[in-house]
Amino acid sequence: MEFKVIEGGICAAKGFKANGVYCGIKRPANDTPNAKHKNDICIFVSDVVCNTAAVYTQNKVKGAPILVTKANLEKSGNKAIAVIANSKNANTCNADGVEKAEMMCEMLANELNVPKEQVVVASTGVIGQVLPIEPIKAGIPDLVKGLCYNKNLEAATAIMTTDTVKKEYALEFEINGTKCH
């Protein structure tokens, strides 16, 4: 089988929309009202419920998003329709992490009108800090409103921490004469 690298990231696959915005999870110390900020939260949404698979850390210390995602996939029979992810804060090793991860899933589910068990959550960033939920709550309506089949770069930018390259990749291949992405 031959694979071809293509543009589009998550949006290269038919039926997947994405968006990323800045909501203010961690404001810079020298923040000004007109400052340009890097996106810090994103969503990926499928047109239909998808079968899912997940690989989890074997580490004894697991972040709240991992625990919530695992529980949601168990409840949904490994089905998901959306992912919500943030940067700047790993939501790991803090007292209310699970509650905040569950809230992220529930808020997005309510905005999309889907079961919360079909939403999975991811966080990347600093470990051990409390995740501020209010900026996320305020940002979710804009995320959903701006969902589009070509906003993969906005979403990829939102999950960058100290990375210099966006975390996205898309392939094209053929199965029985049908092109797949």
Tell me what each language-model feature is:
Residues 75-79:
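Interfacial helix-loop-helix linkers and transmembrane-helix boundary segments
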Residues 1-61:
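N-terminal amphipathic/basic leader segments beginning at the initiator methionine
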Residues 82-94, 120-127:
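Short glycine-rich or small-residue beta-strand-to-loop segments that form or flank ligand, phosphate
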Residues 40-43, 65, 81-85, 117-120, ...:
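Structural motif
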